[in-house]
Every structure is written in C-alpha cells, then in structure tokens.
Amino acid sequence: FITRADSPLQFVHEIKDARLNVGPLQSGTAMSATTLYRQLFGTTSPEATTSYLSNEDALVKLTGDKSVDVVVVVAGQPAKLLADMKAEARGLIKLLRFDAEHPSSKAALGTYVRATVRAASYPNLLSEDLPGLAVQAYLVTYDYNRSATVSTMTRFARSLCQNFATLQAKGHPKWREVQLALPELKAGWRYYPPVQKELASCIA
C-alpha cells in the first residue's frame, strides 16, 4: 500500500474513504485489494473513489496531480516497481504498515497472512522493515482421476522437487521463502493425492 510521503495515513486500516487504485480490472491485484477492503471495512470500495490503472500510471497520479491517495501493489518481494526506485523516491512516497492487532485486521488474517516488507529489498525506500500482508498462492486442479491428469501433475511435482534447490538459488528471490512442506488446508480443500505423494517423498 503506497501513499504520498506527506500523507497523514500510516496504516492500512486507515484507507477507508481514500481514493484507491487497485490495479487493472479483473487482475489478481484488483481481486486481492477489493477483497481486503471488504474484509477490513465490511463494505465494498466505493466506485467513485476506486480506479483501475496500471501501477505505473497510478503512481504518476499519486505524486503528480494527486488524484489517487493510495496505490495497492501485489507482487512477489522484491517487487521490481519498488526495487528500481531512486533514493529521491523516499521524499515522494511511503508504504503503509499493516497492524495485525487492530480489530479490523481479524477478518483479513483469515484469508491473508502476515508478512514483512524488508528494507533490504527496497533500500532506497525503506530504512526499516515494515509489517505487511502476503497472498498465498495455490495450484488448483479438478480432482480428475484420468491418467493424463495424474501423469501431468505427478511430473510437475517431481520436477519441482528435483529443481527446487536451483529455483531457490537462481530464481526470483521469493523462491527463498517457499517451503515444500504440506501445511494444513482450509476446510473443504485437500491435496491432490498424486502430488501429495510426490511432495511427501521429496521432503521426507
């Protein structure tokens, strides 16, 4: 959650009634931003104060004509958009903190998880780590017991296991935070047995 450096806003739970940019329509960012807004405030983000610009265009509006108050960005850390910023950016923008103890945060933490926005990821923007939120990613498939589906998903899981160390060493830095463990899923969801078998043997 990005706002102007001189904004009185400090926390995510203070964005109600702010002019938000939530990313392009039907994008993952727009879905996450509008879901989080609804969970925080029990209502949808007002259409009159919600825009659907790209991150780059929204930042121009944020710091230029100031027709946007908050730009919501959902990206793997470090997000290139922020990591590439010059030191002067610190005088123009800042990131909002997520207060997990605030009463409005309880519903959000049923869907999203706590995260740390690291100063090391954005040295030109942050002087200290900030509490934030993370979106968990899932690969979802129909529970087809067809041989082609079983074969494809088994090969995918096996390849992930075999190449996991390479992904962590040479892939996007976010891979270093990924674990191959099989955490408990929310009610109504279960692991696809062929994938579960492969991953279980991989981490054994």
Spans of model-derived segments:
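Bilobed "Venus flytrap"/periplasmic-binding protein-like clamshell domains
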Residues: 1-61, 65
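Solvent-exposed coil/turn segments that connect beta secondary-structure elements
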Residues: 4-7, 25, 75-77, 98-101, ...
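Short intrinsically disordered coil segments
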Residues: 16-19, 110-115, 154-158
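Short, surface-exposed beta-edge/turn micro-motifs
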Residues: 17, 69, 135-137
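A ligand-binding cleft/hinge motif common to bilobed small-molecule-binding domains
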Residues: 34, 38-43, 64, 69-93, ...
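Glycine-rich, charged/polar anion/phosphate-binding loops
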Residues: 56-59, 80-81, 123-126
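Periplasmic-binding protein-like
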Residues: 90-141
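Segments of small-molecule ligand-sensing domains
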Residues: 126, 130-204
